[in-house]
């Protein structure tokens, strides 16, 4: 059974919009967000639809995504138009991102998967603690 919740009023929407505005430096950027509950023990899959600035190519968007995360230990970027699946992140502290081009030239989909019990909770807390205390980022995680 699959259930959608938080349509238009999800508890994290204010935080998501706040961080998008900071990252994009565009005050008119906003997200409409809802979540889906599925019967799995671990894993979150997010579909994030983006409308890039007019004239920005798919390759430019992919390069931006790739360059932003290429040096991050726990974030993997798939090749263009490849889509991640949740089974590839179960029991890991990693996030896998894919960027897919659809039939419309001005809409792309970023697909993100992570293990909500590691990267989404305990693993992320350990990673943040390590970084804040200038320890090796992966101490106690790997």
Question: What do the predicted segments below correspond to?
Answer:
Residues 94-97, 101-142:
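NAD(P)-dependent Rossmann-like dehydrogenase/reductase catalytic/cofactor-binding core
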